[in-house]
Every structure is written in C-alpha cells, then in structure tokens.
Amino acid sequence: MMLIKKIEELKNSEIKDIIDKRIQEFKSFKNKSNEEWFKELCFCILTANFTAEGGIRIQKEIGDGFLTLPREELEEKLKNLGHRFYRKRAEYIVLARRFKNIKDIVESFENEKVAREFLVRNIKGIGYKEASHFLRNVGYDDVAIIDRHILRELYENNYIDEIPKTLSRRKYLEIENILRDIGEEVNLKLSELDLYIWYLRTGKVLK
C-alpha cells in the first residue's frame, strides 16, 4: 500500500524527531493542572469547523480568559481574533466551565474511550473528533482524530469507498478501527499515526 510506504519513509526522516517531540509535549500534560487541561479543551472546541493554526493563535491570545472572561467579552475577543463562529464558541466555552476540573474527570475513567463518551455526551460543541483531539493533546494514545485530511488520505488509498458527509458514532468507530489496523502495520499508536498522515496532507506538524 502506498500510504504504508510513505509513512515508513517519514519514520526514517527528520520528521520522526519532530513528531516524537510533539508527542512528548502531549505526554507532559499528565503533570499539568486542571486549568491547563481546560484551556486545551477550549482549543479543541475552537478548532471545530475552523483551522488548527487559528485555534492555536486564539488560544495564545486568550489564555486564562477561557476560564474567567464574561461571555460577552469572550465573544468580542473571538470575533476580533477572526473566529467565524464567535457567538457559538463563546457559548460552548462558558457552558463547559462547569467541567473546570476536566483533568480529574478524565483521569477518573478506566480508559480514554470511556472518557471520550463522557465528553461527547456532556460537553456542548464536542463531538467524537473534538473529544479525540482533546484526549490526544493531553497525552492519550488510543483515539483517532478523523478530520477531512485523514478521510481524504484513506479514500485516496482505497481504505474507504467514499468520504462520508457526516460521521455517525458507528461510522467514526469503524474508520478508527481502520486507522488502528494501519497503525499496527507501521508500528505506530493512533496518536502518532495522526501526526504522520497530517504531515503527508499538509506538510505541517501541529497539534
């Protein structure tokens, strides 16, 4: 398979060091506070139907404001920083504040897949992709972030027959299992595989 070959080539290049470093940054969240985890959750809420770069920029600008700013002020900041859906995202972030102890909550579950179900059910603005993104970014390995880049790569390499317009829970888990199989073939965890495929599609290693 062409995708396997491309990933193996990247694993033997300097990109591997960049990806390994990024994974270590994610793992360092195990030693961070509830507040830092909450800010990362807000980043993942922001990136839905937006860009990762835009989310990173806004996260840096707002910082602790995710925890403290009144909704109207947060809305205004998101608008000025160029977020397309500033009203909705401000609403979701303010509603999510009842889970400010998000690290404690997530770590109370037996594994990341159980934690993901909780996040999807309880936090407005968080679907399977966003929940997986958050969990990967705070150091968990066994969840896949299935976005358009990943879907296109799978489609172009004949792992899926079509690019679904929407992803039901069943479809999400089905595609996640395909990615898990690919990961096993190239000896990568889902958290790592995502960064390799993202690099293949975009030439970037983000978060």
Swiss-Prot record:
Keyword Transferase tagged: no
Keywords, alphabetical: DNA damage, DNA repair, Glycosidase, Hydrolase, Lyase, Multifunctional enzyme
Superkingdom of origin: Archaea
Residues the UniProt record annotates as site (Important for guanine/8-oxoguanine distinction): K207
MF annotations from Gene Ontology: class I DNA-(apurinic or apyrimidinic site) endonuclease activity; hydrolase activity, hydrolyzing N-glycosyl compounds
Catalytic reaction equation(s): 2'-deoxyribonucleotide-(2'-deoxyribose 5'-phosphate)-2'-deoxyribonucleotide-DNA = a 3'-end 2'-deoxyribonucleotide-(2,3-dehydro-2,3-deoxyribose 5'-phosphate)-DNA + a 5'-end 5'-phospho-2'-deoxyribonucleoside-DNA + H(+)
GO biological process terms, semicolon-separated: base-excision repair
pH dependence remark: Optimum pH is 8.5.
Pfam families: Ogg-HhH
Active-site positions on this chain: K129, D147
Role played: Catalyzes the excision of an oxidatively damaged form of guanine (7,8-dihydro-8-oxoguanine = 8-oxoG) from DNA. Also cleaves the DNA backbone at apurinic/apyrimidinic sites (AP sites). Has little specificity for the base opposite oxoG.
Family assignment from sequence similarity: Belongs to the type-2 OGG1 family.
Entry text on domains: Contains two domains separated by the central HhH motif. The C-terminal domain undergoes a conformational change upon DNA binding.
Protein name, entry field: 8-oxoguanine DNA glycosylase/AP lyase
Organism of provenance: Methanocaldococcus jannaschii (strain ATCC 43067 / DSM 2661 / JAL-1 / JCM 10045 / NBRC 100440) (Methanococcus jannaschii)
Gene that specifies this protein: ogg
